[in-house]
Amino acid sequence: MGSGDTRGESSLVAKPIEIILNKLPHAILAQQQFQKYITSPIYRYLSKLLLFREVAWPESTKDTQKGQVGIFSFQNNYADSATTFRILAHLDEQRYPLPNGAAEKNLPSLFEGFKATVSIIQQRLLLDNVDGATNSDKEKYVQLPDINTGFVNKTYSRIDLTHLLEDVETNVENLSINKTLEMDELTRLDSMINELESRKLKILERVKHIDSKSTNLENDVTLIKDRINFIEEYSLEADREQSLRKQMEEERSSEASSFTQNEEAISSLYDVESKDTRLKDFYKMPHEKSHDKNRQMHIISETYSRNSTAFRMTIPHGEHGNSITALDFDTPWGTLCSSSYQDRIVKVWDLNHGIQVGELPGHLATVNCMQIDKKNYNMLITGSKDATLKLWDLNLSRELYLDHSPLKEKTEEIVTPCIHNFELHKDEITALSFDSEALVSGSRDKKIFHWDLTTGKCIQQLDLIFTPTHSDIKMPARSLNNGTCLLGTEAPMIGALQCYNSALATGTKDGLVRLWDLRVGKPVRLLEGHTDGITSLKFDSEKLVTGSMDNSVRIWDLRTSSILDVIAYDLPVSSLDFDGKLITVGANEGGVNVFNMERDEHWMTPEPPHSLDGDELSRRIAIVKYKDGFLINGHNDGDINVWTL
């Protein structure tokens, strides 16, 4: 064969290769459907062909190198051309594995997919040469043949009809294959959407975690600011060397001089004028409380859905040792104060870590009731069997609890977290409640005192009048703790009370609920229904909920004074709380009974695992408090459990 024949053969080879390089890769690579069913090595090779045409084959030398493109395509520095061709032509299943269940889907083969896609490529090549063709036109994957039904009805040529039938069947088959490809694409998109949803949930969890960390840092900022304000309030700022020097000098001082100074301080502590001054100064100090709590509550409410009880922590048995007699806390996860039977010291806890951060010594007997200010001041008011009420500065109690507190270096006076004593009752305090600037206390002496918190003075005295039938009722002991106040065989004379502005509700041992108007100092309504002493009550603008030793909880309509519902239990109700939607009840059982008034649903908190070791009597609930989705209950064995509802 001569050289002329060789050039002729090269010319015949170059023309199809030019078509492949100029037209076919563009059309094939533009099809997502083709990309999926052609293996990735071949797809990459087609891409390299385009790059080779544009870079390695400049316009000035195209004509002279077209005949050599077949050789250039398989030349490399790692293998000969034959080996390179076998590698490129090999379909590696590991590189493009079939999805699970692909065999069951009966997907078209690679060749069938190629045949169905060729028509699409041809149409797009034609549309590329048509002026004014839009992208929407190019998206029409398959154009159906124009079948002349009149010709079909009139022709008698079997050959023509056979060819037409083959053409139509081919198009039907191609449409079926394309439909299968599109449905598989839809399945893949659904899988991607599910994967994105899963990733979205993971991102949301990370956002919650970040938000929680941010909230903790913001709480730390608030804590630092409060600490700075505290140092400024009590003039505690001093350099480190001066503080150490002062401590060494005090250690050298004699016990006699220290005793003399302490004695003078004690006498000044009980001076009435100095106490009144300290109470006024207390309200002038900026007792900042963190109000940016909605974010943390939002996160917790997302993590723990409504009506699902989640156990958070336990302050272990042994911290109190005896039955919890009173507790209250500041939401969310702020300060918890608690007291136990025969323990005269109120303990202050940090609910973030479940550790004790302060103590309030001063009462001479068991503390029966307490309340933390929920608005502006970080203060606590307690009522005791020693017939006194005390107002405490919780910030100061935390400071004094520290071993290195500079306040302990002040020997010229005794510093105590007790800001004021309320001393008018003649018998033990069994219930108290305060709101805004008013404090109301009830005692076993059958008297209710209305106090002005700003001055510490008694505004008025309310006398309870009992009928002879109820004047000397003796109740048998039904549990270690009657609930909010007393331990013993006698029901509390005033078991519970709550005030709001000028409204006051009291529950007494005769089973009656009295509604008072503090502006006139007289009861304006009487609610009858309980058959035994009332141990707890709580009201809002529409409803009043009461718990009694008659084993029942009653829900009252304050507008009509009628009973809306009665919930019966097997044992006396020791304590309850109410926020307008949920009622939490301690009925001398191992768990807290929860009642959702809106949904009419009842459930009970489970017993924590550690509590299963004790006897039934020690595991009973003595007192419950519920605020903003947080439930805290105290047991007869001294344990305090924290829950989210």
UniProtKB/Swiss-Prot annotation:
Residue ranges, annotated region (Sufficient for interaction with FIS1):
74-126
Coiled-coil regions listed in the entry: 160-253
Where are the residues of the annotated region Disordered? 242-262
Query: In its UniProt entry, what is this protein called?
Result: CCR4-associated factor 4
What's the encoding gene here? CAF4
Subunit comment for this entry? Interacts with DNM1, FIS1 and MDV1, components of the mitochondrial fission machinery. Interacts via its WD repeats with DNM1. Interacts with CCR4 and NOT1, components of the CCR4-NOT complex. It is however not a component of the 1.0 MDa CCR4-NOT core complex, but appears to be part of a less characterized, 1.9 MDa CCR4-NOT complex. Interacts with DBF2, another likely component of the 1.9 MDa complex. Interacts with SRB9 and SRB10, components of the SRB8-11 complex.
Composition bias of kind Basic and acidic residues appears in 242-254
Alphabetically sorted, this entry's keywords are: Coiled coil, Membrane, Mitochondrion, Mitochondrion outer membrane, Repeat, WD repeat
Gene3D superfamilies under this entry? 1.20.5.170, 6.10.250.1070, YVTN repeat-like/Quinoprotein amine dehydrogenase
Topology in membrane: Peripheral membrane protein
Q: Which GO terms describe its biological process?
A: mitochondrial fission
